Amino acid sequence: MKLNKRFFYGVLTAVALLAAGCSKDNTDPVPDPGTGEQLVENPKVRAAVRTMMSEAARTESTLNGVAVWQEEYASSGEWPKGSDNDTRRQMWSVTKTFTSMAVGIAVGEGKLSLSEKVAPMFPEEVAEAEKNMTDAQKANLEALTVRHLLIMANGHKKDPTVEYATEYFKKDPFGSLKYIHNEWVDVSGLLTKHDSTLPELFFGYPFDAAPGEKFCYDSFSSCMLSEIITKKTGETMADYLYKRMFKPMGLDRPEWEDIHGVTAGGWGLHLSTDEMLAFGRLLLDGGKWDGQQIIPEDYLKEAVKDQIKDRMNNGQNYSTTGYGYQIRTRSDGSLYMAVGLFGQYIVVIPDKKAVIVMTSAMPFDADNILKDLSKVMALLNGDLDSSVKPLELAWKYIVPEL
Protein backbone atom coordinates (compact mmCIF):
# COMPACT_ATOMS: atom_id res chain seq x y z
CA MET A 1 0.00 0.00 0.00
CA LYS A 2 1.34 3.39 -0.87
CA LEU A 3 1.32 4.89 2.60
CA ASN A 4 3.27 7.70 4.16
CA LYS A 5 4.19 5.24 6.91
CA ARG A 6 6.68 3.62 4.58
CA PHE A 7 8.45 1.72 7.33
CA PHE A 8 5.36 -0.30 8.19
CA TYR A 9 4.83 -1.28 4.59
CA GLY A 10 8.44 -2.06 3.93
CA VAL A 11 8.18 -4.58 6.74
CA LEU A 12 4.87 -5.94 5.45
CA THR A 13 6.23 -6.31 1.92
CA ALA A 14 9.32 -8.10 3.17
CA VAL A 15 7.22 -10.49 5.20
CA ALA A 16 4.91 -11.17 2.25
CA LEU A 17 7.81 -11.86 -0.09
CA LEU A 18 9.49 -14.11 2.45
CA ALA A 19 6.30 -16.05 3.06
CA ALA A 20 5.74 -16.50 -0.65
CA GLY A 21 9.18 -18.08 -1.00
CA CYS A 22 8.88 -20.44 1.98
CA SER A 23 7.13 -23.74 2.45
CA LYS A 24 5.74 -22.85 5.87
CA ASP A 25 3.82 -19.89 7.23
CA ASN A 26 5.70 -16.94 8.68
CA THR A 27 4.73 -16.37 12.32
CA ASP A 28 6.73 -13.19 13.03
CA PRO A 29 4.50 -10.28 14.11
CA VAL A 30 4.22 -7.19 11.91
CA PRO A 31 2.68 -3.78 12.69
CA ASP A 32 -0.91 -3.29 11.59
CA PRO A 33 -1.23 -0.30 9.20
CA GLY A 34 -4.43 0.91 10.82
CA THR A 35 -3.60 0.54 14.50
CA GLY A 36 0.14 -0.13 14.78
CA GLU A 37 -0.53 -3.31 16.78
CA GLN A 38 1.90 -6.20 16.33
CA LEU A 39 -0.02 -8.98 14.60
CA VAL A 40 0.65 -12.31 12.92
CA GLU A 41 -1.11 -13.89 9.95
CA ASN A 42 -3.86 -16.43 10.41
CA PRO A 43 -2.08 -19.59 9.18
CA LYS A 44 -5.32 -21.10 7.87
CA VAL A 45 -6.05 -18.01 5.78
CA ARG A 46 -2.43 -17.87 4.62
CA ALA A 47 -2.67 -21.46 3.37
CA ALA A 48 -6.08 -20.84 1.78
CA VAL A 49 -4.78 -17.83 -0.15
CA ARG A 50 -1.89 -19.86 -1.53
CA THR A 51 -4.15 -22.74 -2.51
CA MET A 52 -6.58 -20.37 -4.20
CA MET A 53 -3.84 -18.74 -6.25
CA SER A 54 -2.42 -22.12 -7.20
CA GLU A 55 -5.78 -23.18 -8.60
CA ALA A 56 -6.12 -19.85 -10.40
CA ALA A 57 -2.76 -20.45 -12.08
CA ARG A 58 -3.69 -24.01 -13.05
CA THR A 59 -7.00 -22.93 -14.58
CA GLU A 60 -5.49 -19.97 -16.46
CA SER A 61 -7.59 -17.55 -14.46
CA THR A 62 -6.91 -13.84 -15.01
CA LEU A 63 -6.74 -13.35 -11.22
CA ASN A 64 -3.55 -11.42 -10.46
CA GLY A 65 -3.90 -10.41 -6.83
CA VAL A 66 -5.71 -11.43 -3.67
CA ALA A 67 -5.39 -10.16 -0.11
CA VAL A 68 -7.34 -10.88 3.06
CA TRP A 69 -7.60 -8.98 6.33
CA GLN A 70 -9.40 -10.21 9.42
CA GLU A 71 -9.62 -8.54 12.79
CA GLU A 72 -6.80 -9.58 15.18
CA TYR A 73 -4.62 -10.87 12.34
CA ALA A 74 -2.09 -9.46 9.91
CA SER A 75 -3.19 -9.48 6.29
CA SER A 76 -2.32 -12.33 3.94
CA GLY A 77 -1.89 -11.98 0.20
CA GLU A 78 -0.50 -13.36 -3.05
CA TRP A 79 0.41 -11.46 -6.20
CA PRO A 80 1.46 -13.71 -9.08
CA LYS A 81 2.39 -12.77 -12.63
CA GLY A 82 4.98 -10.12 -11.70
CA SER A 83 2.86 -7.91 -9.45
CA ASP A 84 2.83 -7.31 -5.69
CA ASN A 85 0.86 -5.62 -2.91
CA ASP A 86 2.06 -2.20 -4.08
CA THR A 87 1.01 -2.61 -7.73
CA ARG A 88 -1.86 -0.33 -8.69
CA ARG A 89 -4.44 -1.68 -11.12
CA GLN A 90 -7.53 -0.30 -12.82
CA MET A 91 -10.49 -0.73 -10.50
CA TRP A 92 -13.20 -0.35 -13.13
CA SER A 93 -16.54 -0.03 -11.31
CA VAL A 94 -15.06 -0.49 -7.84
CA THR A 95 -14.47 3.24 -8.41
CA LYS A 96 -18.19 3.85 -7.96
CA THR A 97 -18.10 2.99 -4.26
CA PHE A 98 -15.36 5.58 -3.70
CA THR A 99 -17.54 8.10 -5.54
CA SER A 100 -20.35 7.28 -3.12
CA MET A 101 -18.10 7.98 -0.14
CA ALA A 102 -17.24 11.40 -1.60
CA VAL A 103 -20.97 12.10 -1.74
CA GLY A 104 -21.37 10.95 1.85
CA ILE A 105 -18.62 13.27 3.06
CA ALA A 106 -20.16 16.19 1.14
CA VAL A 107 -23.53 15.43 2.72
CA GLY A 108 -21.90 15.36 6.14
CA GLU A 109 -20.32 18.76 5.47
CA GLY A 110 -23.69 20.21 4.52
CA LYS A 111 -22.65 20.85 0.93
CA LEU A 112 -25.13 18.46 -0.64
CA SER A 113 -28.45 16.74 0.02
CA LEU A 114 -29.54 13.39 -1.38
CA SER A 115 -33.00 14.81 -2.05
CA GLU A 116 -31.58 17.69 -4.10
CA LYS A 117 -32.81 17.87 -7.70
CA VAL A 118 -30.13 17.36 -10.35
CA ALA A 119 -31.53 19.41 -13.26
CA PRO A 120 -31.15 22.87 -11.63
CA MET A 121 -27.43 22.21 -11.16
CA PHE A 122 -26.95 21.98 -14.94
CA PRO A 123 -29.31 24.61 -16.41
CA GLU A 124 -27.62 25.04 -19.79
CA GLU A 125 -27.19 21.34 -20.54
CA VAL A 126 -30.75 20.55 -19.42
CA ALA A 127 -32.28 23.39 -21.47
CA GLU A 128 -30.52 22.13 -24.59
CA ALA A 129 -31.44 18.49 -23.98
CA GLU A 130 -35.11 19.25 -23.29
CA LYS A 131 -35.50 20.64 -26.81
CA ASN A 132 -35.60 17.03 -28.00
CA MET A 133 -37.68 15.55 -25.15
CA THR A 134 -41.32 14.65 -24.82
CA ASP A 135 -43.28 16.14 -21.93
CA ALA A 136 -43.06 12.81 -20.11
CA GLN A 137 -39.28 12.67 -20.51
CA LYS A 138 -38.97 16.25 -19.23
CA ALA A 139 -41.03 15.37 -16.18
CA ASN A 140 -38.82 12.35 -15.48
CA LEU A 141 -35.66 14.42 -15.77
CA GLU A 142 -36.98 17.19 -13.57
CA ALA A 143 -37.83 14.62 -10.85
CA LEU A 144 -34.27 13.24 -10.80
CA THR A 145 -32.44 13.57 -7.45
CA VAL A 146 -28.93 12.84 -6.20
CA ARG A 147 -30.25 9.72 -4.46
CA HIS A 148 -31.61 8.38 -7.75
CA LEU A 149 -28.09 8.64 -9.19
CA LEU A 150 -26.65 6.78 -6.19
CA ILE A 151 -29.04 3.82 -6.47
CA MET A 152 -28.86 3.50 -10.28
CA ALA A 153 -32.48 4.45 -10.90
CA ASN A 154 -32.10 7.65 -12.90
CA GLY A 155 -34.80 7.07 -15.52
CA HIS A 156 -32.59 5.65 -18.26
CA LYS A 157 -33.62 2.21 -19.49
CA LYS A 158 -30.15 1.31 -20.77
CA ASP A 159 -26.59 2.23 -19.83
CA PRO A 160 -25.51 5.00 -22.22
CA THR A 161 -21.84 4.39 -21.39
CA VAL A 162 -21.78 1.21 -23.45
CA GLU A 163 -23.74 2.76 -26.30
CA TYR A 164 -21.56 5.87 -26.57
CA ALA A 165 -18.29 3.94 -26.25
CA THR A 166 -19.39 1.48 -28.93
CA GLU A 167 -20.48 4.34 -31.19
CA TYR A 168 -17.15 6.12 -30.82
CA PHE A 169 -15.18 2.92 -31.34
CA LYS A 170 -17.07 2.02 -34.50
CA LYS A 171 -16.58 5.53 -35.92
CA ASP A 172 -12.80 5.25 -35.62
CA PRO A 173 -11.80 1.70 -34.65
CA PHE A 174 -8.11 1.99 -35.42
CA GLY A 175 -7.81 5.42 -33.82
CA SER A 176 -9.56 4.06 -30.75
CA LEU A 177 -7.11 1.18 -30.33
CA LYS A 178 -4.55 3.51 -28.74
CA TYR A 179 -6.83 3.73 -25.70
CA ILE A 180 -6.49 -0.01 -25.03
CA HIS A 181 -3.42 -0.80 -22.94
CA ASN A 182 -1.93 -3.96 -21.50
CA GLU A 183 -3.41 -3.55 -18.04
CA TRP A 184 -6.33 -1.19 -18.62
CA VAL A 185 -8.64 0.52 -21.10
CA ASP A 186 -8.66 4.33 -21.17
CA VAL A 187 -12.42 4.82 -21.42
CA SER A 188 -11.99 8.36 -20.11
CA GLY A 189 -9.55 9.19 -22.90
CA LEU A 190 -11.92 7.77 -25.50
CA LEU A 191 -14.76 9.96 -24.22
CA THR A 192 -12.54 13.05 -23.87
CA LYS A 193 -11.51 12.64 -27.50
CA HIS A 194 -14.99 13.84 -28.47
CA ASP A 195 -16.34 17.36 -27.96
CA SER A 196 -19.48 16.55 -25.96
CA THR A 197 -19.14 16.82 -22.19
CA LEU A 198 -20.39 14.03 -20.00
CA PRO A 199 -23.40 16.03 -18.70
CA GLU A 200 -24.38 16.75 -22.31
CA LEU A 201 -24.24 13.04 -23.10
CA PHE A 202 -26.08 12.10 -19.90
CA PHE A 203 -28.96 14.54 -20.35
CA GLY A 204 -29.12 13.79 -24.06
CA TYR A 205 -30.02 10.16 -23.40
CA PRO A 206 -33.76 9.35 -23.15
CA PHE A 207 -35.36 9.54 -19.69
CA ASP A 208 -38.08 7.02 -20.48
CA ALA A 209 -38.70 5.80 -16.92
CA ALA A 210 -39.68 7.59 -13.74
CA PRO A 211 -36.61 8.02 -11.49
CA GLY A 212 -36.52 5.63 -8.55
CA GLU A 213 -38.80 2.99 -10.07
CA LYS A 214 -36.42 0.82 -12.07
CA PHE A 215 -32.82 -0.26 -11.43
CA CYS A 216 -30.65 0.27 -14.50
CA TYR A 217 -26.90 -0.02 -14.09
CA ASP A 218 -25.57 3.22 -15.55
CA SER A 219 -21.96 4.35 -15.20
CA PHE A 220 -22.91 7.85 -16.28
CA SER A 221 -24.89 8.18 -13.03
CA SER A 222 -21.64 7.75 -11.13
CA CYS A 223 -19.86 10.23 -13.37
CA MET A 224 -22.65 12.75 -12.78
CA LEU A 225 -22.09 12.39 -9.03
CA SER A 226 -18.49 13.43 -9.62
CA GLU A 227 -19.67 16.41 -11.66
CA ILE A 228 -21.96 17.38 -8.77
CA ILE A 229 -19.15 17.09 -6.20
CA THR A 230 -17.09 19.52 -8.29
CA LYS A 231 -19.99 21.96 -8.62
CA LYS A 232 -20.76 21.87 -4.90
CA THR A 233 -17.20 21.96 -3.54
CA GLY A 234 -15.17 23.74 -6.21
CA GLU A 235 -12.72 20.81 -6.27
CA THR A 236 -12.32 17.77 -8.46
CA MET A 237 -13.59 14.66 -6.73
CA ALA A 238 -10.07 13.20 -6.76
CA ASP A 239 -8.72 16.23 -4.86
CA TYR A 240 -11.74 16.36 -2.56
CA LEU A 241 -11.52 12.69 -1.58
CA TYR A 242 -7.75 12.74 -1.23
CA LYS A 243 -7.89 15.53 1.36
CA ARG A 244 -10.77 14.04 3.31
CA MET A 245 -10.22 10.29 3.05
CA PHE A 246 -6.98 9.10 1.48
CA LYS A 247 -4.66 11.52 3.29
CA PRO A 248 -6.18 11.06 6.77
CA MET A 249 -5.72 7.30 6.27
CA GLY A 250 -2.04 7.80 5.43
CA LEU A 251 -2.58 6.85 1.79
CA ASP A 252 -0.84 8.47 -1.14
CA ARG A 253 -2.80 10.45 -3.71
CA PRO A 254 -4.70 8.00 -5.92
CA GLU A 255 -4.24 7.63 -9.66
CA TRP A 256 -7.60 8.67 -11.10
CA GLU A 257 -8.62 9.37 -14.69
CA ASP A 258 -10.65 12.41 -15.71
CA ILE A 259 -13.06 13.33 -18.50
CA HIS A 260 -12.63 16.89 -19.75
CA GLY A 261 -10.93 17.72 -16.44
CA VAL A 262 -13.63 16.16 -14.22
CA THR A 263 -12.77 13.04 -12.21
CA ALA A 264 -14.29 9.89 -13.76
CA GLY A 265 -16.83 8.78 -11.16
CA GLY A 266 -17.81 5.45 -12.70
CA TRP A 267 -14.37 4.02 -13.45
CA GLY A 268 -10.77 5.18 -13.72
CA LEU A 269 -9.45 4.73 -10.17
CA HIS A 270 -6.21 2.74 -9.92
CA LEU A 271 -5.38 1.09 -6.58
CA SER A 272 -3.18 -1.60 -5.03
CA THR A 273 -4.55 -4.51 -3.03
CA ASP A 274 -3.28 -2.90 0.19
CA GLU A 275 -5.15 0.31 -0.62
CA MET A 276 -8.26 -1.74 -1.38
CA LEU A 277 -7.93 -3.52 1.96
CA ALA A 278 -7.65 -0.21 3.80
CA PHE A 279 -10.86 1.02 2.16
CA GLY A 280 -12.68 -2.20 3.01
CA ARG A 281 -11.59 -1.86 6.62
CA LEU A 282 -12.84 1.74 6.65
CA LEU A 283 -16.29 0.54 5.57
CA LEU A 284 -16.26 -2.36 8.03
CA ASP A 285 -15.43 -0.01 10.91
CA GLY A 286 -18.39 2.27 10.21
CA GLY A 287 -16.35 4.90 8.37
CA LYS A 288 -13.68 5.23 11.08
CA TRP A 289 -9.93 4.97 10.64
CA ASP A 290 -7.66 4.87 13.68
CA GLY A 291 -10.46 6.43 15.73
CA GLN A 292 -11.21 9.27 13.29
CA GLN A 293 -14.69 9.41 11.71
CA ILE A 294 -13.98 9.91 7.99
CA ILE A 295 -17.27 8.81 6.41
CA PRO A 296 -20.45 9.90 8.23
CA GLU A 297 -21.70 6.82 10.06
CA ASP A 298 -25.39 7.39 9.31
CA TYR A 299 -24.67 7.77 5.58
CA LEU A 300 -22.58 4.60 5.51
CA LYS A 301 -25.26 2.57 7.28
CA GLU A 302 -27.69 3.45 4.50
CA ALA A 303 -25.07 3.03 1.77
CA VAL A 304 -24.54 -0.67 2.51
CA LYS A 305 -28.26 -1.55 2.75
CA ASP A 306 -30.50 -2.70 -0.10
CA GLN A 307 -31.89 0.58 -1.45
CA ILE A 308 -33.27 -1.01 -4.59
CA LYS A 309 -33.64 -4.66 -5.59
CA ASP A 310 -31.22 -6.16 -8.12
CA ARG A 311 -30.01 -9.71 -7.62
CA MET A 312 -26.52 -10.76 -8.69
CA ASN A 313 -25.11 -14.31 -8.76
CA ASN A 314 -28.48 -15.65 -7.59
CA GLY A 315 -28.30 -19.00 -5.81
CA GLN A 316 -24.60 -18.74 -4.99
CA ASN A 317 -23.06 -18.32 -1.53
CA TYR A 318 -21.71 -14.95 -2.68
CA SER A 319 -25.00 -13.69 -4.10
CA THR A 320 -26.28 -10.19 -3.43
CA THR A 321 -29.90 -9.10 -3.32
CA GLY A 322 -29.78 -5.40 -4.03
CA TYR A 323 -27.90 -2.22 -4.61
CA GLY A 324 -27.10 0.44 -2.04
CA TYR A 325 -25.29 3.68 -2.67
CA GLN A 326 -22.98 2.52 -5.49
CA ILE A 327 -22.29 -0.84 -3.86
CA ARG A 328 -23.73 -4.38 -4.10
CA THR A 329 -25.60 -5.37 -0.94
CA ARG A 330 -27.37 -8.26 0.77
CA SER A 331 -30.67 -7.77 2.58
CA ASP A 332 -29.56 -9.52 5.78
CA GLY A 333 -26.47 -7.32 6.08
CA SER A 334 -24.07 -10.27 6.02
CA LEU A 335 -22.22 -9.14 2.90
CA TYR A 336 -21.57 -6.13 0.70
CA MET A 337 -19.06 -5.61 -2.06
CA ALA A 338 -17.62 -3.14 -4.51
CA VAL A 339 -17.49 -4.88 -7.89
CA GLY A 340 -15.48 -4.03 -11.00
CA LEU A 341 -15.36 -5.45 -14.52
CA PHE A 342 -13.20 -8.56 -15.14
CA GLY A 343 -12.94 -9.45 -11.44
CA GLN A 344 -12.04 -6.49 -9.24
CA TYR A 345 -13.54 -6.85 -5.76
CA ILE A 346 -13.61 -5.34 -2.31
CA VAL A 347 -15.71 -7.81 -0.30
CA VAL A 348 -16.74 -6.98 3.27
CA ILE A 349 -18.10 -9.76 5.50
CA PRO A 350 -19.20 -8.05 8.74
CA ASP A 351 -19.97 -11.14 10.85
CA LYS A 352 -16.48 -12.49 10.09
CA LYS A 353 -14.94 -9.02 10.63
CA ALA A 354 -13.06 -9.63 7.42
CA VAL A 355 -12.26 -8.03 4.08
CA ILE A 356 -11.27 -9.89 0.90
CA VAL A 357 -9.91 -8.00 -2.11
CA MET A 358 -9.12 -9.35 -5.56
CA THR A 359 -7.78 -7.93 -8.80
CA SER A 360 -7.82 -9.50 -12.26
CA ALA A 361 -6.32 -8.81 -15.67
CA MET A 362 -8.24 -8.18 -18.88
CA PRO A 363 -9.10 -11.38 -20.77
CA PHE A 364 -7.56 -10.30 -24.06
CA ASP A 365 -4.11 -9.52 -25.46
CA ALA A 366 -3.64 -5.75 -25.71
CA ASP A 367 -0.27 -6.18 -27.45
CA ASN A 368 -1.92 -8.04 -30.32
CA ILE A 369 -5.29 -6.35 -30.21
CA LEU A 370 -6.36 -7.12 -33.76
CA LYS A 371 -6.24 -10.83 -32.92
CA ASP A 372 -8.67 -10.28 -30.06
CA LEU A 373 -10.79 -7.57 -31.68
CA SER A 374 -13.94 -9.64 -31.25
CA LYS A 375 -13.34 -9.65 -27.50
CA VAL A 376 -12.91 -5.88 -27.50
CA MET A 377 -16.25 -5.48 -29.25
CA ALA A 378 -17.83 -7.89 -26.76
CA LEU A 379 -16.43 -5.72 -23.97
CA LEU A 380 -17.99 -2.60 -25.46
CA ASN A 381 -21.31 -4.41 -25.80
CA GLY A 382 -21.17 -5.50 -22.15
CA ASP A 383 -20.94 -9.19 -23.04
CA LEU A 384 -17.43 -10.00 -21.81
CA ASP A 385 -16.90 -10.42 -18.09
CA SER A 386 -14.88 -13.07 -16.27
CA SER A 387 -15.61 -11.69 -12.82
CA VAL A 388 -17.46 -14.63 -11.25
CA LYS A 389 -14.45 -16.98 -11.11
CA PRO A 390 -12.58 -15.04 -8.37
CA LEU A 391 -15.65 -15.09 -6.14
CA GLU A 392 -16.05 -18.84 -6.67
CA LEU A 393 -12.44 -19.38 -5.63
CA ALA A 394 -12.71 -17.08 -2.62
CA TRP A 395 -15.80 -18.86 -1.30
CA LYS A 396 -14.23 -22.24 -1.99
CA TYR A 397 -10.97 -21.61 -0.16
CA ILE A 398 -10.86 -18.42 1.91
CA VAL A 399 -14.31 -17.87 3.43
CA PRO A 400 -14.44 -21.31 5.15
CA GLU A 401 -11.24 -20.43 7.03
CA LEU A 402 -12.43 -17.08 8.39
Across the structure, where does each feature detected by a protein language model lie?
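Active-site helix/loop module of the DD-peptidase/beta-lactamase fold
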Residues: 109-161, 204-206, 210, 220, ...
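Bacterial Sec-dependent N-terminal signal peptides
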Residues: 10, 15-43
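A short, well-structured edge-of-sheet supersecondary motif
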Residues: 52-83, 346-347, 353-357
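Active-site Gly/Thr loop motif
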Residues: 251-253, 301-355
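Active-site-proximal alpha-helical segments within enzyme catalytic domains
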Residues: 221-228, 267-288, 344-361
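Short, charged, amphipathic alpha-helices and their helix-cap/turn boundaries
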Residues: 73-78, 119-120, 163-210, 235-254
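Active-site SXXK
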Residues: 72, 89-115, 149, 225-229, ...
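Structured C-terminal helix/loop/strand segments within mature extracytoplasmic catalytic/sensor domains
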Residues: 335-402
